[in-house]
Amino acid sequence: MRTFLALELPGETAMQIADWRDRQFGHVGRPVPPANFHLTLAFIGELSESALERLCLTTEAWLADGEPPGGEILLDCTGYWPKPGIYWLGPNKWPETLSQLAGKLRHLTTAVGARRDRNAFRPHVTLFRNCSTAPPVTAPAISWQYRHFTLFESRQGKTGVSYHPLQHWELTPQNN
């Protein structure tokens, strides 16, 4: 099973991003469907069902010691990674607690046999794949609150990739 841990975007936030993207861009690559928008915390890749069960158990044990906090993210910058051809929207700055959450989840995934992700954590929402160049555009300012994270399975189908939630974990509500 090909899996990853991520923050889900609320439906209205995903549609807001898709509307902005679709108004700004022509054909610069393959657009990611709004239903697939997410912010990856830890890429797991292929892992057996028994290893995924261990991951769920260790995650629940870690959370039993106290849920990490949720938070708010302002998506206010765009970026481009030429090697994979990814054009993305992300935060210019993000809460340290988000980096800590991603770091802990990456540690838990490698502890159950997932390959260690050597890339630095850079929160982002992928807008386009197979993008040959970074389009010059001013980023919007779209904020959203994250209150849980999700274990997703990635499935390849006739119409492309789809992501299916397998497990959700709550985060402590942010104090405002």
Describe the function of each predicted region.
Residues 1-176:
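Histidine-dependent nucleotide/RNA phosphoesterase domain, centered on the 2H-phosphoesterase fold
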